């Protein structure tokens, strides 16, 4: 997971007195980043929070008339795609030498147009109280999620808008192979009650 530093065509935030931030992490993180940067710099931050897939689509739509300055957060692949398509500007962070090797590899793969700032793992979130109420055992592996007991009880993000959902599919393909992975997704579908726009949606639903 990473942050793209500067969107291609973005202007100087200090010169304009404002910065347009596209943020693809939890809205609470986005708000904290915007608030603290604004306090430290005096630059007004206009923040838009969307999933990685949606933000990539927005950047493509705005390619001829870029409106964003910085894209922070989300999964790595959409940032690499944006870098390859020339949607991101090249930038060298001053602290590049202090970053973890995986973060630097992201920077190198993006040819200096994106850099890793945090990493995370895909996992399952559940509400213990609801599981107890419905006499369900907490899922411990991917196979558990397709059990009939969970029919209509699961939410997952939509890969058309969410980078997290794309990572889930890519993970399943690596674990099972393409054919078995998509057969698994087909088996999982009856247990899904909603496909959310972003990867944070399902977690909020069980909180």
Where are these regions (language model features)?
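Extracytoplasmic ligand-binding site segments that recognize negatively charged/polar headgroups
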Residues: 24-31, 67-207
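Generic anion/oxyanion-binding catalytic loop in active/binding sites
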Residues: 4-5, 19, 60, 134
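Short alpha-helical segments and helix-capping/turn motifs at coil-helix boundaries
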Residues: 6, 56-58, 108-110
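Bacterial N-terminal signal peptides
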Residues: 1-9
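Early extracytoplasmic/lumenal segment of secretory-pathway proteins
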Residues: 16-81
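Sec/Tat signal peptide C-region and signal peptidase I cleavage site
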Residues: 10-15
């Amino acid at each position: 997971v990473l942050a793209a530093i500067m969107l291609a065509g973005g202007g100087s935030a200090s010169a304009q007195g404002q910065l347009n931030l596209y943020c693809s992490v939890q809205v609470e993180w986005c708000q904290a980043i915007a608030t603290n940067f604004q306090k430290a710099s005096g630059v007004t931050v206009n923040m838009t929070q969307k999933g990685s897939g949606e933000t990539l689509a927005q950047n493509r739509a705005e390619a001829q008339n870029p409106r964003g300055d910085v894209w922070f957060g989300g999964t790595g692949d959409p940032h690499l795609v944006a870098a390859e398509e020339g949607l991101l500007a090249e930038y060298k962070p001053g602290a590049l030498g202090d970053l973890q090797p995986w973060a630097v590899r992201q920077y190198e793969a993006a040819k200096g147009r994106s850099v890793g700032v945090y990493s995370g793992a895909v996992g399952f979130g559940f509400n213990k109280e609801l599981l107890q109420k419905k006499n369900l055992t907490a899922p411990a592996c991917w196979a558990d999620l397709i059990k009939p007991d969970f029919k209509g009880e699961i939410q997952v993000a939509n890969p058309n808008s969410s980078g997290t959902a794309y990572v889930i599919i890519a993970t399943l393909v690596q674990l099972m192979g393409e054919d078995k992975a998509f057969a698994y997704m087909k088996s999982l579908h009856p247990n899904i009650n909603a496909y959310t726009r972003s990867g944070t949606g399902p977690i909020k639903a069980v909180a």
